[in-house]
């Protein structure tokens, strides 16, 4: 081999050695990622975001920091996700309200305002009362609601026109009452609503039982029923509306992860694959099961189709409930 040839090989080898770190440096993520949560700390959406962030951090080797951006019945946080730079360093957990808010004229955002990454959770609502409430079962509460004056009783659970509000409206209508017979007090999520319930600020809260669990276990509230086809195995003593009232009414919230539109395909694919690993991880399964949160998986394409169906269904439900505008 000539000296020139040897020099050529050495140069090529050095170039290859330099190229390898360059390729590695191009891998996503290279710095911390922000996960925006549109709802308050301690609620089901916040808890789901934080366990996912913790496992993503281990999986992808960079911090994933959850930031709560509340307000506007969910509009503030959902807008922040949609308006983030499409570089993968700000993503978010989006909720069923994104299929509802635009029907009320609160925002122009729809499920198609995002790059879907993965669907990871679905939960039905429960009906909670203060621990000192005279109502020990759902029939007693239902009778009291029917006997009350319009607007006399107050309820909370999420923002105006949010999924837990719609759950209450549907239940009232199923009992033959107007959807606004119980006055809705908007909140930034289930956690602050449950605190308000425990303090006596409202008469009942509709939210998932897992979201209410901390206040219930502290002896400050109790759950009377769930709006689901069957009982939650983590809360076997909480009956369904159908069992107790003969009302076959159920609904639920969903949560998934998304980025802004035009997120690069490589980054979106990396995140969806990582979220799939999170979903199948022991940490996520044990966390969700221990709290009674539902686990539902959909990849990016499945999540997009799921949101389209949810958008149509919520539009129909909100028009029927008189909550839609236009």
Which residues are covered by each model-predicted region?
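C-terminal lobe and pocket-closing loops
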Residues: 122, 211-280, 309-312, 317
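Sec-exported extracytoplasmic/periplasmic mature domains
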Residues: 53, 57, 61, 82-86, ...
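Residue-level signal for nonpolar/aromatic packing positions in well-ordered secondary structure
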Residues: 33-35, 42, 49, 66, ...
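Hinge/capping helix and adjacent helix->loop/strand transition within the periplasmic-binding protein
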Residues: 83-89, 103-192, 241, 254-287
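N-terminal export signals
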Residues: 2, 8-24
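N-terminal (or domain-start) structured segment
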Residues: 24-112, 177-203, 297, 323-326
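An extracytoplasmic/periplasmic, membrane-proximal ligand-sensing/linker region
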Residues: 30-32, 265-326
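A ligand-binding cleft/hinge motif common to bilobed small-molecule-binding domains
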Residues: 96-106, 165, 169-176, 199, ...
């Amino acid at each position: 081999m000539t000296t020139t040839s040897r020099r050529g090989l050495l140069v090529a080898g050095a170039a290859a050695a330099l190229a390898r770190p360059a390729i590695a440096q191009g891998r996503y993520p290279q710095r911390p990622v922000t996960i925006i949560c549109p709802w308050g700390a301690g609620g089901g959406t916040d808890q789901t975001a934080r366990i996912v962030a913790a496992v993503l951090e281990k999986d992808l080797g960079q911090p994933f920091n959850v930031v709560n951006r509340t307000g506007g019945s969910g509009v503030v946080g959902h807008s922040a996700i949609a308006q983030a730079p499409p570089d993968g360093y700000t993503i978010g957990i989006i909720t069923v309200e994104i299929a509802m808010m635009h029907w009320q004229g609160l925002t122009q955002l729809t499920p198609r305002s995002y790059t879907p990454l993965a669907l990871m959770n679905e939960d039905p609502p429960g009906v909670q009362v203060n621990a000192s409430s005279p109502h020990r079962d759902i029939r007693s509460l239902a009778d009291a609601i029917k006997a009350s004056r319009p607007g006399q009783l107050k309820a909370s659970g999420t923002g105006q026109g949010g999924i837990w509000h719609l759950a209450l409206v549907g239940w009232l209508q199923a009992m033959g009452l107007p959807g606004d017979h119980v006055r809705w007090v908007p909140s930034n999520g289930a956690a602050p609503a449950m605190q308000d319930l425990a303090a006596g600020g409202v008469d009942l809260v509709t939210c998932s039982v897992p979201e209410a669990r901390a206040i219930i276990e502290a002896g400050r509230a109790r759950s009377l029923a769930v709006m689901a086809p069957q009982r939650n195995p983590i809360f076997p003593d909480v009956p369904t509306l159908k069992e107790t009232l003969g009302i076959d009414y159920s609904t639920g919230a969903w949560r998934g992860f998304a980025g802004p539109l035009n997120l690069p395909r490589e980054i979106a694919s990396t995140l969806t694959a990582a979220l799939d690993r999170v979903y199948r991880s022991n940490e996520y399964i044990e966390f969700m099961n221990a709290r009674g949160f539902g686990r539902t998986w959909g990849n990016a394409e499945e999540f997009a189709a799921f949101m389209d169906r949810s958008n149509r269904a919520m539009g129909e439900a909100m028009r029927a409930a008189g909550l839609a505008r236009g």
